[in-house]
Amino acid sequence: ARGDVAARLTAAGIDTRAAVIYRQTLLDLTEEARALLSDRRPVIVPLYSPRTAARLAEVATPRAPLHLVAMSNAVTRAAAALHAENRVIADSPDAPAMIRAVLATVRRVEGM
């Protein structure tokens, strides 16, 4: 698991056991997503995890101008291979901050 918390706690002298509580299955891009990324119109892409950002960078070959909105610096680093018009990092790693960042990006893109 990311961060290997159980191993770090055990190394600090706290007896722990690891358990996977949530596992996200990576999916391929839908045809609709591929079509949007192939267009020349701007696409705002909210990215919530480094894993998803890396996967998008791996499978996408966008022609569209991308405007990436990332939940954290780690997410932005994972998307480094994607060419983007701009990259925004949310003020904090939570849903309200992501919503604010996406809305600010929408306003900026629409003003272009």
Task: Give names to the regions the model predicted.
Residues 1-112:
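Conserved beta-alpha
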